[in-house]
């Protein structure tokens, strides 16, 4: 028996009856389809800043395998910029920006980049004022990855908004003013309980990062992140940087055995040694660096146009 993806949770006879089932017939999903180079801007009642009588979803992906969404700007949506549904697998969403959402501030709204499929990659995505900027939903099978994603003025946590979304990777995900949660949410959201297991937050920043260990021995891991930390999970190298800069890019390069910089385009920040008394040469270098505008994720995404032609399918 050969599987095309790692299992994101253990399957034991002590837990439940486990079996392998072959799907009858041909794979009926659409394949090798994508959406790119668009602006999706919803009209709304400008006299009502909480208007919801307008477009909710930007790109909705279901019954698709090996698809992509690339270089799409979203504005004024009430729900999600991109949704990958349960029958979506091997989907890449990259270089996308969501701004100025219009809706009530409440549940099931502004789940900006929402993944309910498996083997989905969201990389270099930017979200403003999302309720849940980067999340997996209801039992997303995984593995799924959010890599180099920034949320600005976040109104709620990122992580998983449904129960048991196992095998999540948050790699260089930055949440402004809110949390990343890999934990037991109890009765929150109609009783989510354990929202994920066997997940990793790597080199992320957030107001708080919550990670719990699961009673069955499954762990959630937090490595080289910057935040306030809470929970019984595995926390290592807290408030420190680590190498490699991107865990995802490092593993992909190792698996393929070749350079993947054109695919991953990692925005690697320079690490300066902290010192109250730097040498003259180091101080001069720091002064020169301070004169340059900091490259934001929006700028990095905007710069993607010159890379796309060489890696775009077809």
Please provide the spans of the model-predicted regions.
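Catalytic domains of carbohydrate-active enzymes that cleave complex glycans
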Residues: 147-152, 166-312
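Short helix/loop capping segments that flank catalytic or ligand/cofactor-binding pockets
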Residues: 11-12, 43-48, 69-70, 81, ...
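Small/polar beta-strand repeat architecture
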Residues: 1-47
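Short acidic, gly/pro-rich beta-turn/loop elements at beta-sheet edges
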Residues: 11-13, 45, 103, 180, ...
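Solvent-exposed loop/turn segments connecting transmembrane beta-strands
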Residues: 83-85
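Right-handed parallel beta-helix
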Residues: 31-42, 65-76, 88-103, 116-132, ...
């Amino acid at each position: 028996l050969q599987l095309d993806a790692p299992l994101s949770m253990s399957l034991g006879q002590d837990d439940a009856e486990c079996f392998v089932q072959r799907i009858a017939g041909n794979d009926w999903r659409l394949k090798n389809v994508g959406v790119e180079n668009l602006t999706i801007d919803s009209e709304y009642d400008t006299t009502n800043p909480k208007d919801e009588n307008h477009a909710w979803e930007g790109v909705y992906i279901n019954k698709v395998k090996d698809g992509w969404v690339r270089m799409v700007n979203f504005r004024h949506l009430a729900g999600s910029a991109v949704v990958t549904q349960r029958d979506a697998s091997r989907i890449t969403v990259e270089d996308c920006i969501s701004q100025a959402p219009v809706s009530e501030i409440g549940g099931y709204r502004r789940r900006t980049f929402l993944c309910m499929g498996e083997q989905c990659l969201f990389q270099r995505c930017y979200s403003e004022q999302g309720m849940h900027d980067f999340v997996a939903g209801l039992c997303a099978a995984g593995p799924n990855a959010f890599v180099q994603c920034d949320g600005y003025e976040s109104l709620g946590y990122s992580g998983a908004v449904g129960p048991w979304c196992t095998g999540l990777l948050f790699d260089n995900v930055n949440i402004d003013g809110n949390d990343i949660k890999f934990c037991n949410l109890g009765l929150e959201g109609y009783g989510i309980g354990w929202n994920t297991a066997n997940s990793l937050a790597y080199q992320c920043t957030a107001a708080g990062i919550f990670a719990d260990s699961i009673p069955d021995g499954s762990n959630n891991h937090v490595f080289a992140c910057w935040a306030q930390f809470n929970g019984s999970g595995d926390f290592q190298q807290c408030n420190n940087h680590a190498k490699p800069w991107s865990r995802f890019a490092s593993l992909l390069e190792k698996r393929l055995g070749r350079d993947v910089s054109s695919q991953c385009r990692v925005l690697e920040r320079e690490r300066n040694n902290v010192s109250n008394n730097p040498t003259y040469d180091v101080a001069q270098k720091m002064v020169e660096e301070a004169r340059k505008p900091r490259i934001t994720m929006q700028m990095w995404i905007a710069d993607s146009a010159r890379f796309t032609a060489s890696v775009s399918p077809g």
